[in-house]
Amino acid sequence: MAGCTRKLTHLRKRIHRPRRRTTRRWKRWFKFRKRKGEKRPRPNHKAVARRAKLKFSTSEKLHWPEQELAKKSILNAEDSLIIDNKRSISHLSSGVLKDIFTTGTSSYNVLLQSKEEKKYHSQKQSSSTYSKRCRKPSKSPNTSRSKDPRRMKALVPVTSSGTWYCLERRPAVFVTSSVSSPVKFTHDISVTGNGIVLPPKPKSKVKWCHFSTLPKPKPQLSRSFEKGDDFSGKKFCILTAIKPTNLEKEKLRFFKSDYTYNPQFEYANPALPSVLAKHSHASDRFLKQIVVHLTEDLLSRASMTVVNGCPTLTINVSTAREHWLEGMLRHEIGTHYFRGINNLQQPWNSWTGRKKHELKPNNPTEEGLASIHSVLFRKDPFLWRAALLYYTVYQASQMSFCELFKDIGRFVKDPNTRWDYCVRAKRGWTDTSQPGCFSKDQVYLDGILQILRYRDTIDFHLLTALGKVSYEDVDRLKGLAVTENMRVPHFLQDHGRYMEHLEKIMEVNELTDRELKDLI
C-alpha cells in the first residue's frame, strides 16, 4: 500500500510540474519505468537550475511599484541566478536607451534593439523592406523594431549607477553602460520571480489580393438571337437591347392624348443601326390570306366567316385564355427546351460546327414548330395570334405608331391589347412617328406555313432529335447525328396521332395543300 501511495505521489508530482518539452520527458520516463527493478532517476540539480534560469529569462511580469524602489532591486549581482559578467557584455549608448524607454508603446517590457547602432539601422531597413514586400500597413518606428517575444531582451535596472541586466533566453548577461543615462524615472522597474508567458505581438491582419491574368467570366447570353454592342464593348441580346426603358411613361402619355401622340422610346443599351436595319424589312407574302378579328362579344370561342370576299377569323379572347398555359408549355418546353438539349450532343452545337456543316438558320423552323405545338391539342387550333403579329409588323413598316394603333383597331377592340401589339412591332425605334418595324414577329407564321407545306415529308421525331436545325437539313444531317439518348416530347411518340392534329390545324384554319404550294 505504501508502494502504491509512493507511485501515486510520484505521478501527482509529475502531473503538477509541467515543464518544457513535455512529450520527450514523458517518453523518457515511461522508458525508465519499463525497465524492471530500476527506479526513476532523480532529477539533476544543475539541470533544474538551468531550466529555472531559462524559465525566468524567457518571460517576466513587470510592473511599476507604488513605493520608491530606486535603491532596491530584486536581482542581486551576487545572486547565483545572475550569471557571470564575463559572457557577452553589451554596451548601449544613452541615445538607444532613451529611445527605448520613452516610446510608451511597451506596457510590460522594454526591448533591446542591437549591440551597435550600425546593426540597428541594418535591421530596420531589412524589416521595412520585408513589410513592403508583404504589403503590411505602415508601422511606427517603435513597433517595427519589435521582434518575436521569445527572442526579446529585457533591460532591468539593478542599481542607480547605470548598471543594467540584459535578460534573454540564454543566461542573463550583466551589462554595464559606459555612459550614464541622463533619463530620470519617477518609478523604478522591479522584476518578480513568478514568470508568465507574455502574449505574442498582435499581428496586423493583411488582406491578400489575388491577381489573375485570366479574364473574368462574362454572363452567357442567348445564342438564339443576334447581339448588339454598346459603347463599352459589352454584348447584349437583341431582344434586351430593343426593350424601352420608359414604356409605362409613354403608354400613359399616349392614352391621355386620345391615341394621337407617337411615343418616343428610350433604351438603356440601344442596338446598332446596322442590326436594326437588318430586322426592319417586313414581308407581305401572306397578307392576302389573313384577316383576324379579336373580340370579347362573341358567344362562341371562335368563328370563321367571309367579309367582303375575304376570309375573316373572329376570336373570343376571354374564352381562349384558359388554354394558353398548356400551349405555352408545349411551345417553350416541348419544343425550344428539348431541341436545345439535343443540340448540345451534336457536332454542330457551336457556331464553328454550324459553319463547318453549312447549316441553314434554325428560324423560321424553330418558331414555326413551337407555334404549331402551342395549338396542337386545342379544340379549335386557330393560328390567329401568329397571323396578327405578321400583319402588325408589316403595317408598322408603313405607318407611324398612331396610324398603326388605329389600323389594328379593326381587329382588336381592347386598347391595352392593341398597345402591346404596336409596341412589339415598333421595338428598337426611338421616334415612332416614322415608319419602321422590328420584323422578328413574322417568323411565327412563316415557319408554320412552311412546316404545314412539307408536313408529309418531314421526320418530326428526327427534327427534334437533331437539335437546332432547319427542316431542310434533316435528310442531309441524319447520317452525322448522334441519336442515342435523345429527348423527344411525349406528343411526338405517336406519329399517327401527331399527323392527325396537323390535319385538323389545316382544316380549322381553312388551309389547303394547293394554297400552300402557291404560297411556298
From Swiss-Prot:
UniProt cofactor(s): Zn(2+)
Keywords per UniProt: Carboxypeptidase, Hydrolase, Metal-binding, Metalloprotease, Protease, Zinc
* Cofactor binding summary note: Binds 1 zinc ion per subunit.
Q: What is the E.C. number?
A: 3.4.17.-
Q: What class of enzyme is it?
A: hydrolase
Entry keyword NAD:
no
List of residues binding Zn(2+): 331, 336, 367
Q: Name one GO molecular function term.
A: metallopeptidase activity
Q: Which domain of life is it from?
A: Eukaryota
Region of interest (Disordered), residue spans? 116-153
Can you tell me which residues form the catalytic site? 332 (nucleophile)
InterPro entries, sorted: MATCAP
The record ties this protein, via Pfam families, to: MATCAP (PF08014)
Which BP terms from GO are recorded? proteolysis
Q: What does this protein do?
A: Putative tyrosine carboxypeptidase.
Task: Tell me the PANTHER family matching this sequence.
Answer: PTHR31817, TYROSINE CARBOXYPEPTIDASE MATCAP2-RELATED
Q: What is known of its domains?
A: Putative metalloprotease with an atypical HExxxH zinc-binding motif instead of HExxH, which interrupts the active site-containing helix without affecting the integrity of the catalytic site arrangement.
Report what the protein is called: Putative tyrosine carboxypeptidase MATCAP2
